Structures are given as C-alpha cells and as structure tokens.
C-alpha cells in the first residue's frame, strides 16, 4: 500500500501549493484553450479515480507495480488540472481565479478522502465509505461544467450567494417575531430552574421598538445586494483590466454585508443589549454606505441610473438615526 500512502501525501502537497501559488506568467491568455484543457484534465481525474477505486474493491488487489501505475495516472491528471489553473492570469479576475481554484481544490480533497478510505479499509470489498468517496469525486469533477467562464459571471454567482444568506437572516428574525411574545416558546419548562418566566427570553416593548429600524437596515441590505446584482447583470463588463478589477472590488465590499447582518440579527435576540445592537447597526450602516459608494464609482452604475443609490443611502441614514434615537439611554 506504499504507493497509495505516497499518493495521499503528494495530493496534500498539490493542494497546499494550489492555494498558495501565483499565476504563471506567459503568453496571451486563450480562454477557449484554457476551458477545453481544464475539462480534459478534470475528466481524466474522474476516470483515474474510478479506476483506482475499482481496483481495490475486491481480491486480487493490484500488485505494487500495478498500484504505482494507478496512482501515477491519478496524480498526473490532478497535476494537469492544477497546471491549467496556474495559466489563468490575475487580469482575468481574482474572483474567477478563486472560483476555479476552489473547484479544483474540491476535486483534490475528494480524491484525498477516497485514497484515505482505501488505506483504512481492511475489507476487500466495495465499502459504503468507498462508494460515497468515489461519488464525491465524480460530483466535484462534474461541477467544472457549471463554472462561470469569466469574471462577470463569477461575480454574479458570488454576490448572489451573499444575498441568499441575508435573506435567510431576515426570514429568521421575522419568524421569531411572528412566533409570539416568547421567541423561545418551544423550550420546555424546567421544574428545577422554574418556569420560562425569565425576562431574558422575552422582548420588552423597548426591544420591539428598536427591532423595527434594525430590521429596516437588514432589509436595506437585501435591497442593496439585489440592486448591485441587477446593475452587474445590466451593465457589468469584463472586457478591460479596469472593469475586471472593479467587479472584484464589488465582491470584496459586498462580502462584508452578510456577516454584518448576521451580527446585528444575533444581537437582536433576547436578552437584548441596546448598546450592542446600536454598535452592530452602525457597523452594518457603514458597510452599506461603502457598498453604495463603490458601486456608484464603478462602471456598473451609469450616472443616469444612480437614483437607487441615493434612495438606499437615505434609507440607511433614516434607519440608523432611528436606532440612535432609541438607544440614547444605553450609552
């Protein structure tokens, strides 16, 4: 099993270099050649992983030489995919590079898992774990066909993901509000601790008043991301280095929105600390202001269509001011 152990070590080394490596400098980038070559190497990886898995499903197991050949075939296919990734220049977009890198990393991680299952298995038959691991490699390999092919498409996918997280946070807070006076009503009473009469599990009237502008900020976050995505779809371009860089800037700034929304949402649950809520609301407000400013200065927002920026900017100010007014006593 020495070739299998060596394969696992080599794959971990490839994974480490993949995440730390820089793009290779070379000739003019050829997009069609890049995607075709990547597709071939990913397909080869899937085939070689299947061969390796099948070879260790039942006796007789491969000889040392046979195992080495199988391992070499799989390692070479993965090295080919990593090499193709290195040919993708930064000028094509940081977001696109990260998307491709993570897709290849998923393939390598799935393959490492498969190899480790083979190493740990003492039963010479197709185990459930081996079956699942092989399927995971296939699934990761199949994802390459769905990858965005330029930075514009990659940015749309990423920012849409941020929007989904924000939507979930808003739904959870609204659900908690509609569940009644006690947001923890599903928690049973404890005879030793006592009834759920503890005020720490309830929103006070002051809490509920403060929730309104905070939820307003969260909804402004949702509207902001939706508008940014719409602007990217309508006006986004990946035709020049400047446009590509501006799209990457939008990803960088919008990625701060969902964590800020989550922080605010968590601080809104009882027992509510109004000073903490105010601080988190201010953080979110600052992030949204930055998103709007960077969007306004980019090519995705023509001057003639910037009214939504002004509207959302005012909405953020309005809700933040209400939050401040309701938390004066907490300072």
UniProtKB/Swiss-Prot annotation:
**Please, which domain of life does this record's source organism belong to?**
Eukaryota
Q: Which Gene3D superfamilies match?
A: I/LWEQ domain, Talin, central domain
Q: Where is this region: Disordered?
A: 175-197
Location comes to: Cytoplasm; Nucleus
Q: Could you list this entry's UniProt keywords, alphabetically sorted.
A: Cell cycle, Cytoplasm, Nucleus
Record field: compositional bias (Acidic residues):
175-192
- InterPro entries found in the cross-reference section: GCIP-like, GCIP-like_N, GCIP_C
Please provide, in alphabetical order, the Gene Ontology terms of the cellular component aspect for this entry. Answer: cytoplasm; nucleus
What main location does UniProt list? cytoplasm
Please give the family membership noted in the entry. Answer: Belongs to the CCNDBP1 family.
**Functional note:** May negatively regulate cell cycle progression.
Q: What is this protein called?
A: Cyclin-D1-binding protein 1 homolog
The species is: Xenopus laevis
Gene name of the record? ccndbp1
